[in-house]
From Swiss-Prot:
Species: Acetobacterium woodii (strain ATCC 29683 / DSM 1030 / JCM 2381 / KCTC 1655 / WB1)
Record's subunit section: Part of the homotrimeric caffeyl-CoA reductase-Etf complex composed of (R)-2-hydroxyisocaproyl-CoA dehydratase CarC, and the electron transfer flavoprotein (ETF) alpha (CarE) and beta (CarD) subunits.
GO cellular component: cytoplasm
SMART domains xrefs: ETF
Top-level lineage group: Bacteria
Catalytic reaction equation(s): hydrocaffeoyl-CoA + 2 reduced [2Fe-2S]-[ferredoxin] + 2 NAD(+) = (E)-caffeoyl-CoA + 2 oxidized [2Fe-2S]-[ferredoxin] + 2 NADH
Official protein name in the record: Caffeyl-CoA reductase-Etf complex subunit CarD
Organism lineage: Bacteria, Bacillati, Bacillota, Clostridia, Eubacteriales
Record localization: Cytoplasm
Cofactor(s) listed in the protein's UniProt record: FAD; AMP
Protein family membership: Belongs to the ETF beta-subunit/FixA family.
UniProtKB keywords: Cytoplasm, FAD, Flavoprotein, NAD, Oxidoreductase
Length: 262
């Protein structure tokens, strides 16, 4: 079995700041990390590999050259191969163009039985790319997956719902997007880190995956980010106290009436 995991290097959102004048993200000095949901997808692939000898785990990302560091982390965790789709032509891609590039890369990789991706990336929160890749590859897709079992060339998964979960059976090959409740990603071992720097990372540009410059990046993006901004800070809340429940309730009702809320 061959499992391909789509991963993304993202800025650590705990460190992100917005330039108040330009409305753009300040990336200088902001550390980059493996997107958390993608780490869950990778762990799911590695668990399947542990349970099914002979399984290969491949990781693919689209990004700048420095994204190779994130791929080495994935190799250190236990992935077998890594592919970096990197080209200036890919710059400025929205989700539609990103999915086109990743789908083209996946097609170039030899037979893949299962594609895993995180539910969404923390730098965009769109949750669109996984489903778009599946559509381009003509694969069935299940989103918000919180449990995976592989049996007889099919995946039996639990799809997270607001009030529980659905049990879905889907034939392979398919694409699954994973949520954090699926697992706890493993840590890199010292030996794994050392081995990761000995392994090659395959780098492909737009020509390698058969895309023209007009079919990827900003040129192929029907949507563009107009502005990014931090929402205005809200004032602190007010604590209502009293000696009895009725007194507190009465004070609350009075304040709500003063503000014409009720």
């Amino acid at each position: 079995m061959r499992i391909l995991v789509c991963a993304k290097q993202v800025p650590d959102t705990n460190e992100v700041k917005i330039d108040p004048k330009t409305g753009t993200m300040i990336r200088e000095g902001v550390p980059s990390i493996l997107n958390p949901d993608d780490a869950n997808a990778l762990e799911a692939a590695l668990v399947i590999k542990d349970e099914n000898p002979g399984t290969e785990v491949i990781v693919m990302t689209m990004g700048p050259p420095q994204a190779s560091e994130m791929l080495r982390e994935c190799l250190a965790m236990g992935a077998d191969e890594a592919y970096l789709l990197s080209d200036r032509a890919f710059g400025g891609a929205d989700t539609w163009a990103t999915s086109a590039t990743l789908a083209a890369g996946i097609k170039k990789v030899k037979k893949v039985d299962l594609v895993l991706a995180g539910r969404q990336a923390i730098d965009g929160d769109t949750a669109q790319v996984g489903s778009q890749i599946a559509q381009r590859l003509k694969m069935p897709v299940v989103t918000y997956v919180e449990d995976i079992k592989i049996e007889d060339k099919k995946a039996i998964v639990h799809r997270q719902m607001e009030d529980g979960y659905e049990v879905i059976e889907v034939q392979l090959p398919c694409l699954l997007t994973c949520v954090k409740e699926l697992n706890d990603p493993r840590y890199m071992s010292v030996g794994g880190i050392m081995d990761a720097y000995e392994q090659p990372i395959t780098i492909w540009n737009h020509e390698d995956i058969g895309l023209s410059p007009e079919a990827c990046g900003l040129n192929a993006s029907p949507t563009q980010v107009f502005r990014s901004f931090s929402p205005p800070a809200k004032g602190g809340g007010e604590m209502i106290t009293g000696t009895t429940v009725n007194e507190v309730a009465g004070s609350l009702v009075s304040k709500l009436k003063e503000k014409h809320i009720i």
